């Protein structure tokens, strides 16, 4: 297999002195160019990196001045040299680039051009294939990032560069901020952006330095305060108010409440006693954020609308969200405002999101959940509650429900299988299955649960199911399909260890794994007896058709030749359907991780 750069040349250059290197380059450059743009560029990247680290400007100039390189390679190398000069403070290189007409103030240098000093590259590396603007930064950004003042000064003398100032702000470098502000003039918009960045970083010294550049009549950008209030930068808030910064008091109070900043809230209310704000809306906001101390403080204010609010549907909805997020202290405070509120949905939210403390508190304080009328007359709600809680894997809550008479009898086969893939947050997937199977009548759910376990590579559950009597043979087809589609190596190894025939259905497994570009699965199957050349080299043909480069290289290492274009025209990809084994369709349910109410309630 060919490496994507000339490793031999890179090593020679690396181990040759500056005095002896130019003759080698002169001798090798023609051959390198003839190898193609990609290999040429990737090789030169590594050579240039080495030259810059040892400040060998003559070697770099020889490459940059070469008339043999294509325009595309030259363009990439130019920008790469800009980045390296910024990274290593090689101002002589930057000056030379400027001298030969390269735009050194470029706004987009591909970020992935940076690579490790160790030169450890995968032979399958693809370091130039993605060009999303999200990964681009400017030359001045890198100059600021690496902090070489000679580079920063050289770039700054070319033009007023707002990106340099803002980069210094984001990197919290007050010395560079002072340098840029003292050396250059910026428009109001740039100054506002810099001040806001300083506020977001909580840097009071930087805020003070920016303030001297903002006239008092222009201190009116209300959005400067949003992060200050939410993050609790009290000293900056006080300073801005002292500097007569115009603020939207209602907005500032809301942001302070969202951050749970009690002392700042008290300060704002004291500073602006005549300001108007809705206590009810603030209570809703602070409850959503789970800040109990701030909530208690807000409730100390009288509000004529509060009594009406706690009897409304909005209050019930608020409790539902609080229970969903698990804010026990907030829930207790709100519950005592109206203990007659309907908590069924709130209770359900607490159960399915695993908040045992809230579940126990509701059971202790709302007797209706232990009342016979609830257990006998609200079967639909109880059924959903039990199934969704099991599907999410909250075993401690299931046991708590069992104590008040809500047993595992409500759990369907479909709900039982959902715990695989949905119970990962609780980390008790296996324990939930074991708890359910304490009653042997639920062993009939084994195959449905096992199918999901093969899909999500949950081999611990499969081993347990086998230990209590599961026969894997009826589901081998669908198990292998999921393994090959989802790259589930643990489950594949388990099947092989237990003597499963991995060549069934005309070696479908290896063909499907190749089609899905799962090289590790392909290798494992080959090592354990699968026929890599089955069906007239189907594996190589499907890899060629779908351009699976890594797999193609692996197959070529096994002396399998690439097929002709004519031979792959008629190749038919394997259809991956919801249930790969149609004969088992009646009792195996295929579904995604989403849990839908109708399916959860209707499916057996």
Swiss-Prot record:
It comes from the Viruses. Pfam families: Ank_2. ANK repeats lie at residues 77-106, 135-164, 166-189, 190-219, 221-247, 248-277, 314-341, 342-371, 380-410, 445-474, 475-504, 505-534, 535-565. The keyword Glycoprotein does not apply. PANTHER family: ANKYRIN REPEAT-CONTAINING PROTEIN (PTHR46586:SF3). SUPFAM superfamilies: Ankyrin repeat. This is Putative ankyrin repeat protein L56. Keywords: ANK repeat, Repeat. It comes from Acanthamoeba polyphaga mimivirus (APMV).
């Amino acid at each position: 297999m060919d490496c994507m750069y000339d490793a031999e040349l890179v090593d020679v250059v690396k181990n040759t002195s500056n005095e002896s290197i130019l003759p080698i380059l002169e001798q090798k450059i023609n051959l390198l160019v003839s190898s193609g743009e990609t290999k040429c560029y990737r090789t030169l990247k590594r050579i240039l990196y080495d030259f810059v680290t040892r400040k060998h400007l003559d070697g770099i100039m020889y490459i940059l001045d070469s008339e043999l390189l294509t325009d595309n390679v030259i363009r990439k190398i130019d920008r790469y040299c800009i980045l390296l000069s910024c990274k290593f403070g090689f101002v002589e290189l930057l000056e030379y680039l400027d001298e030969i007409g390269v735009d050194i103030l470029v706004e987009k240098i591909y970020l992935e051009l940076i690579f490790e000093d160790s030169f450890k590259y995968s032979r399958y590396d693809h370091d130039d294939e993605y060009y999303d603007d999200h990964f681009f930064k400017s030359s001045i950004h890198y100059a600021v990032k690496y902090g070489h003042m000679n580079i920063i000064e050289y770039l700054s003398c070319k033009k007023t560069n707002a990106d340099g100032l803002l980069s210094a702000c984001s990197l919290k470098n007050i010395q560079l901020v002072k340098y840029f502000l003292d050396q250059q003039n910026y428009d109001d918009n740039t100054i506002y952006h810099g001040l806001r960045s300083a506020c977001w970083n909580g840097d009071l010294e930087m805020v003070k330095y920016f303030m001297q550049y903002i006239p008092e009549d222009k201190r009116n950008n209300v959005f400067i305060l949003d992060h200050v209030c939410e993050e609790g930068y009290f000293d900056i808030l006080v300073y801005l108010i002292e500097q007569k910064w115009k603020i939207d008091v209602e907005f500032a109070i809301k942001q302070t409440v969202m951050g749970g900043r009690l002392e700042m809230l008290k300060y704002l209310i004291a500073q602006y006693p005549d300001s108007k704000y809705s206590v009810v809306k603030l209570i809703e906001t602070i409850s959503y954020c789970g800040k109990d101390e701030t909530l208690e403080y807000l409730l100390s204010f009288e509000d004529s609308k509060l009594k009406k609010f706690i009897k409304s549907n909005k209050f019930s909805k608020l409790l539902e969200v609080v229970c969903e997020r698990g804010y026990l202290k907030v829930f207790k405070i709100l519950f005592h405002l109206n203990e007659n509120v309907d908590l069924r949905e709130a209770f359900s939210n607490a159960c399915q999101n695993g908040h045992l403390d809230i579940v126990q508190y509701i059971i202790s304080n709302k007797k209706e959940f232990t009342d016979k009328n609830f257990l006998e007359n609200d079967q639909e709600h109880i059924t959903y509650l039990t199934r969704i809680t099991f599907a999410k894997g909250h075993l401690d809550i299931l046991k708590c429900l069992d104590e008040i008479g809500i047993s595992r009898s409500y759990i369907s086969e479909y709900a039982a299988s959902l715990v695989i893939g949905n119970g990962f947050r609780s980390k008790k997937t296996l324990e939930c299955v074991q708890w359910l199977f304490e009653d042997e009548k639920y062993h009939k759910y084994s195959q449905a649960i096992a199918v999901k376990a093969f899909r999500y590579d949950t081999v611990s559950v499969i081993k347990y199911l086998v230990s209590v009597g599961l026969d894997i043979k009826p589901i081998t087809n669908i198990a292998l399909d999921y393994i090959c589609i989802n790259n589930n190596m643990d489950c594949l190894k388990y099947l092989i260890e237990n003597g499963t025939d991995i060549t069934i259905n005309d070696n479908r497994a290896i063909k499907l794994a190749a089609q899905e570009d799962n090289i590790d699965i392909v290798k494992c199957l080959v090592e354990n007896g699968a026929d890599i050349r089955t069906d007239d080299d189907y594996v190589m043909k499907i890899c060629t058709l779908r351009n699976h480069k890594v797999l193609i290289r692996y197959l070529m290492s096994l002396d399998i030749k690439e097929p002709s274009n004519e031979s792959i025209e008629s190749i038919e990809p394997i259809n991956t359907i919801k249930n790969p084994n149609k004969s088992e369709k009646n009792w195996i349910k295929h579904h995604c991780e989403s849990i839908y109410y109708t399916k959860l309630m209707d499916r057996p």
